[in-house]
Design a protein with these regions (language model features):
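Acidic/His- and Gly-rich active-site-bordering loop/insert found
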Residues: 2-107
Length: 108
């Protein structure tokens, strides 16, 4: 049985890069469902909101204490790769020389 995903951050990054969420059109649903599953598996309460079913937003809440709340925000859509040269396919999540390669690997 593999180690929990939080113990394998490079594996998580590779999996996220493999989702082709180019915007337009976005199509982030599969990626959001994947992240939702990981959070749910970890016991974190989630909620999905969507004006467009293919572009949902995922909310996750962790119970806190007396400190002020903290909001972390991110995105899973990426810009197109048309006309660009890549050393590795942009949605492969390839690993080479100690790095994970792919569209979106650095801008989260």
């Amino acid at each position: 049985m593999p180690a929990p995903i939080h113990e394998r951050p490079a594996d998580l990054l590779t999996e996220l890069i493999r989702f082709e969420t180019v915007n337009p059109p976005g199509n982030e649903r599969a990626c959001v469902e994947y992240v939702d599953g990981l959070l749910t598996e970890a016991g974190i309460a989630t909620e999905t909101l969507a004006a467009d079913p293919e572009r949902p937003n995922l909310l996750a809440r962790l119970p806190g204490g007396d400190a002020p709340p903290l909001l972390l925000q991110g995105h899973v859509d990426v810009v197109p790769t048309d006309g660009q040269e890549w050393d590795e396919p942009p949605f492969s999540g390839a690993r080479r020389d100690g790095f994970v390669w792919g569209r979106g690997a650095l801008d989260m």
